[in-house]
């Protein structure tokens, strides 16, 4: 995180995947303090536990959308408060096994739900989260200029 901060210019934007232990663990409060002091937390996307299992990592993680701002601006934001985009994704479209077996949407009869081209639709919430972000970004001034 510190190295990313060093690489970014002022008002630079970044996204980083972090284990949830960094965001919630009592022993890592200093990391959260570092982030909050130096970055505007524009958004947090909580990922399901099984997200990285097919790649060998058994860890719950989140994506942080951050913007580097100067210390004066950060002090003002932290004093006045600001909104952030938050979303909790529960369905990733595949099973939490080493193969990442795809999971498709099914109806109440147990039949696959198909799109307009006759293809099975993945059972995932990433698309909805992306739409939510796009709407949020269009309505709110999320990135400081």
Which residues are covered by each model-predicted region?
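A conserved structural/catalytic subdomain of Rossmann-like adenosyl-cofactor enzymes
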Residues: 1-145
């Amino acid at each position: 995180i510190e190295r990313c901060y060093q690489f970014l210019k002022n008002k630079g934007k970044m996204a980083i995947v972090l284990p949830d232990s960094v965001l919630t663990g009592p022993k890592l409060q200093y990391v959260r303090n570092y982030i909050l002091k130096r970055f505007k937390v524009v958004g947090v996307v909580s990922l399901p536990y099984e997200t990285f299992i097919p790649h060998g990592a058994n860890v719950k993680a989140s994506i942080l959308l951050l913007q580097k701002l100067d210390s004066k601006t950060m002090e003002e934001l932290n004093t006045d408060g600001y909104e952030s985009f938050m979303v909790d994704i529960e369905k990733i479209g595949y099973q939490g096994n080493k193969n990442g077996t795809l999971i498709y949407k099914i109806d109440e009869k147990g039949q696959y739900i198909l799109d307009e081209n006759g293809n099975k639709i993945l059972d995932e919430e990433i698309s909805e989260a992306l739409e939510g972000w796009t709407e949020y970004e269009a309505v709110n001034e999320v990135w400081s200029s």
